[in-house]
Structures are given as structure tokens and as C-alpha cells.
Swiss-Prot record:
GO biological process: cytochrome complex assembly
Cellular localization per UniProt: Cellular thylakoid membrane
InterPro entries, per database record: Cyt_c_assembly, Cyt_c_biogenesis_CcsA, Cyt_c_biogenesis_CcsA/CcmC
Organism of origin: Crocosphaera subtropica (strain ATCC 51142 / BH68)
Protein name per Swiss-Prot or TrEMBL: Cytochrome c biogenesis protein CcsA
One of the record's GO cellular component terms: plasma membrane-derived thylakoid membrane
Molecular functions per Gene Ontology: heme binding
């Protein structure tokens, strides 16, 4: 089997594995009593990750350069990064819900690369002069890893929003009381007592005694989130924060490396190219997220909404601006 045939086999195998793994994770969420499904899902993601790593290695051997020169190669590198960060996040959280939301992202990326791109884009070609630099590996690989990490962190924030929908809560370690799970008014969400409380309203009868005027049955507010869902929400919020905290410095390093490379290649550190502009917007969005978490003490839905918007911004930065075919970063894509 030559390297080209091996690559064709591995890209289709990666897509098929991730598709089946996505179904396994979804089945595990629908039938939580089937305890072996999450383990099978994790195994599937690990095998898919290995397939994509082998694909990129074969591509490197065939072409003679690090495989990040066009859309096909960068998509598979991105999918490899998403699956790698998925394994880290799943190990940290011990929750199968991570796979429920991350495997569709990885599967969609591989489907786009393996099934949608034209054959000429899936074959390796000589590097354009601008890419013949050692900065290709340094800049592009770090940027792609940052995209993958931020995507996983953002999609976990989206999962948090779904789990806590219609309920504005503050999580453990909040500034309200001594922590615990509380709604935005500070009411504990774990002391969910469905019993009615009878309140006796009394009045003096003028002879030293009391007379009951009325008995009122007070039913506590019904809490929509079970303790299990609240624990899951806390885990998702924490893991999302930590994963984004890992992706942000990678994005920062990637942008700095790109500026140095741009100065060597084009004589300017910053040209306000569409890709550069959206990279800055992406950096600002996640900088605002981390600033709100670290200095303002935001937790729960407000920072999760900001992180969820970052998922869209990352995709616009990575893929959207290149659909225009304009700017210094348009080579190797559609036009």
C-alpha cells in the first residue's frame, strides 16, 4: 500500500469512526444505565485520533513538509486537535457528556475534508514560496491547536447553557452565601423541599390568649434542576473554563509567531489582513471571557454565553474569512 492509498483509507476511516463514536455517545446519553457505552466511545475517539495522526504523518513523508499548507491538511489537523483535547477534557471531567458535544464537531470537520473538498485539494502539492519557512510549523500548528482547544472549551460552554436552560444560577464558590448552587436571587437550589409549609397567623384576643386567624399553605418554588444536573453543570463550567484557559495562551503565542513571520515575509508585523483582524477579534473575545472570570468573578450563564459566541468567532476566523478569497492568507483554500 503506497502513501496516497493509505491516506485515502485513513481519512475515510477517521470520518466513519467519529460518526459511529458520535452515535455511541448519544446512545450512552439516552441510556445511561448501559455503562460500557462511554468506554467504547472513548476508545473510538482514541482510535480516530491515531488514524488522523498517521494520516498527517504519511502526508508529511509524501510531501516532505509539515502538512498544514492547504485546507484539507489543516482540517484534519484541526480534527486531530479536537479529538486530543476531547480526551483531555473527558479525563478531567469524568463525564460522557463531553463526547456528546465534541464528537459532532470532529465528525463534521472530517466529513467536510474527506467528502466535500475536490480531489485536487486533497492531494499534496509543492509549497508556494511564502510558505517555505520554518515558521510554517511554529505559527500554523500553534494557531490550529489554539482553535481546536477554544472550540472544545466553547462547545462545553454551550452544553452548560443547554443543561441550565431557563435557570440563572450561580455555582460553587459564588459570592452569595457560603457557596453551593443558587439562583440569581441567592436561593439555594439544593434544598428542594416539595412539602407544603403551614404558617399560622395569630392575634391577641385581649385576654392573654391568642386566636388563630388563618392557616396559609405555602408551597416552595419548584426547582427545575436536579442535584445531578447541577453537579454536571458545575463540571461543564469548570472544564470549559480550564480548557479555554489553555487555548488562550496558545492563541497568543500563535499570533505573535505569525507577526514575526509576517515581518520576515512581507516586511510588516501587522497588515490588518482579514485573517489578522479576525484573529485579533478572537483574542479579544476570549480575553474578555477570562477577564470576566478571573477579575470580575463571573460564573455560570453570563460567561458561558460569551464563550459560546467565541465558538462562532473562531470558525469565522479559521474558515469564514478565507471564503472571500481575499488577503494575504487566501492561498491554499478555495480560490
Amino acid at each position: 500500500m503506497d502513501l496516497i492509498t493509505l491516506q485515502n483509507f485513513l481519512d475515510n476511516s477517521s470520518f466513519l469512526l467519529l460518526f459511529l463514536t458520535m452515535l455511541i455517545y448519544w446512545a450512552g446519553a439516552a441510556f445511561p444505565n448501559v455503562t460500557w457505552l462511554p468506554t467504547l466511545g472513548t476508545t473510538g475517539v482514541a482510535i480516530a485520533n491515531l488514524c488522523m495522526a498517521t494520516l498527517l504523518g504519511a502526508r508529511w513523508l509524501e510531501a516532505g513538509y509539515f502538512p498544514l499548507s492547504n485546507l484539507y491538511e489543516s482540517l484534519f489537523f484541526l480534527a486531530w486537535g479536537v479529538t486530543a483535547i476531547h480526551l483531555v477534557a473527558e479525563q478531567m471531567s469524568r463525564s460522557a457528556l463531553v463526547g456528546v458535544v465534541t464528537t459532532p464537531v470532529a465528525m463534521g470537520i472530517t466529513a467536510f475534508a474527506a467528502l466535500s473538498l475536490p480531489p485536487e485539494m486533497q492531494t499534496s502539492a509543492p509549497l508556494v514560496p511564502a510558505l517555505k519557512s520554518n515558521w510554517l510549523m511554529m505559527h500554523v500548528s500553534v494557531m490550529m491547536l489554539s482553535y481546536a482547544t477554544l472550540m472544545v472549551g466553547s462547545v462545553l460552554a454551550i452544553a452548560f447553557l443547554v443543561v441550565t436552560r431557563n435557570r440563572d444560577i450561580e455555582l460553587k464558590g459564588s459570592s452569595v452565601g457560603t457557596g453551593g448552587y443558587r439562583d440569581k436571587l441567592g436561593r439555594s437550589l439544593l434544598n428542594n423541599n416539595h412539602k407544603q409549609t403551614t404558617v399560622n397567623l395569630t392575634q391577641s384576643n385581649g385576654s392573654g390568649g391568642t386566636a388563630i386567624l388563618e392557616s396559609v399553605a405555602v408551597k416552595p418554588e419548584t426547582v427545575t434542576l436536579s442535584p445531578q444536573r447541577l453537579n454536571l453543570a458545575d463540571t461543564l463550567d469548570n472544564i470549559s473554563y480550564r480548557i479555554i484557559g489553555l487555548g488562550f495562551p496558545l492563541l497568543t503565542i500563535g499570533i505573535i509567531a505569525g507577526a514575526v513571520w509576517a515581518n520576515e515575509a512581507w516586511g510588516s508585523y501587522w497588515s490588518w489582513d482579514p485573517k489578522e483582524t479576525w484573529a485579533l477579534i478572537t483574542w479579544l473575545v476570549f480575553a474578555a471571557y477570562l477577564h470576566a472570570r478571573i477579575t470580575k468573578g463571573w460564573q455560570g450563564r453570563k460567561p458561558a454565553i460569551l464563550a459560546a459566541s467565541g465558538f462562532v468567532v473562531v470558525w469565522v476566523c479559521y474558515l469564514g474569512v478565507n471564503l472571500l478569497g481575499k488577503g494575504l492568507h487566501s492561498y491554499g483554500w478555495f480560490f
